[in-house]
Amino acid sequence: MKKALIVVDIQNDFCRGGSLEVADGEKIIPYINHLMKTNNYDEIILTQDFHPTEHKSFAVNNGKSVGEIINLNGTSQTMWPVHCVQGTPGVEFHPDLEKNHATHIIKKGMNPEIDSYSAFFDNQKLIDTGLSNYLKSKDIETVEIVGLALDYCVKYTCIDAVSEGFKVILHFNGTKAVNLHPDDAKNTVFELLEKGVSVIN
């Protein structure tokens, strides 16, 4: 059975000192590097949040405060600080991530009108990143998932991977949550278990 590792958004803006810092986000990088080197994956996919300056998920572009939730083109949208803007240092992969192991990179969030948490689709399922077809073309049956952040991009990548017919394993030691609310990480894990995701340490 062929397997792939999906490494979600290990980028400067989500790590220490970044504009949308996930607490201790950079501390999972050694774990991820170890997986990439030792687990004999057939494919290793890196995803990269890759926003234009005018992206509508940015609070400043809507006159809103960070953390507010608005209706954006028919979809509930959390307002975020400006992050992972194309051409800025924040969009780059964290320097400690051994990205030389990657076989494929998926860029997401490029449409300014729709956010894109999942590595497979945007939040309205209008844009397909091509990841599912790529994995299926390589005869991948199992996907293991790590990265940032557990309660957003990792969560929706896991859910979409299940819906696309893959066996999905989340490495809990390879992810961290934003935790806009204190129980978000715990609630996300319970939700993923209910969706059929296996969660391992």
Regions found by a protein language model. Name each.
Residues 1-5:
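Extreme N-terminal starter segment of soluble prokaryotic enzymes
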Residues 8, 48, 172:
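Active-site flanking residues adjacent to catalytic metal/cofactor-binding acidic residues
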Residues 18-25, 119-123:
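Short glycine-enriched, charge-decorated loop/helix-capping segments at active-site entrances
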Residues 22-37:
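Short catalytic helix/loop segments, enriched in acidic residues and glycine
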Residues 34-142:
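Active-site alpha/beta core segments
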Residues 35, 154-165:
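Histidine-anchored nucleotide/phosphate-binding helix
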Residues 78-81, 95-104, 182-201:
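Structural recognition of alpha->loop->beta junctions
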Residues 144-147, 167-179:
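A short glycine-rich beta-strand->turn/loop micro-motif centered on a GG-aromatic cluster
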